[in-house]
């Protein structure tokens, strides 16, 4: 089944069609985010869901490079969390981000993670600060990522299992075979 193969088929998609997402698709994506595990069930994450084309275009400038495709996505999900609610907010937000991506793949949609934390715009402004400014995000929340989602605009081959680096797997101790 596709569920068994999600990690094989989930590939970063930076090219999208013009087709919008259905409300059911958006709700399913957000359910996956809200069901994602978090440390001590702190649920320190929050999400801003953007489908407005002008806002997507503006958000596409959140980094100096590797974010322009956000403008062509049907949806962008900004993943943020409250460091005061969890000392492992980065991990919690990262898990939520990948849950959104895996759910997108399961729906037959494409997605791509845009890293915001510790990145900068073309003018040198911290990407986190840029995103805070355009989306009116409260200061206590830190933005980790933007997940761009849409209908796939190109085909990508599944991950080639022949390239798996099995030497990075250690049994019982480092170096164990």
PLM segments and residue spans:
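Acidic, surface-exposed loops and disordered segments
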Residues: 1-177
């Amino acid at each position: 089944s596709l569920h068994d193969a999600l990690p094989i088929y989930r590939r970063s998609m930076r090219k999208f069609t013009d087709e919008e997402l259905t409300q059911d698709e958006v709700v399913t994506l957000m359910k996956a985010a809200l069901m994602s595990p978090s440390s001590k069930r702190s649920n320190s994450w929050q999400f801003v869901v953007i489908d407005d084309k002008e806002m997507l275009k503006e958000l596409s400038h959140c980094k100096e490079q590797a974010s322009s495709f956000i403008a062509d996505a049907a949806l962008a999900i900004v993943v943020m969390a409250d460091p005061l609610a969890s000392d492992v907010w980065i991990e919690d937000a990262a898990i939520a981000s990948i849950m959104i991506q895996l759910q997108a793949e399961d729906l037959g949609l494409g997605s791509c993670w845009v890293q915001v934390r510790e990145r900068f715009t073309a003018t040198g402004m911290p990407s986190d600060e840029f995103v805070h400014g355009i989306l009116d995000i409260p200061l206590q929340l830190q933005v980790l990522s933007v997940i761009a989602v849409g209908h796939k605009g190109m085909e990508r081959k599944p991950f080639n299992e022949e390239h798996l680096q099995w030497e990075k797997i250690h049994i019982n101790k480092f170096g164990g075979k």
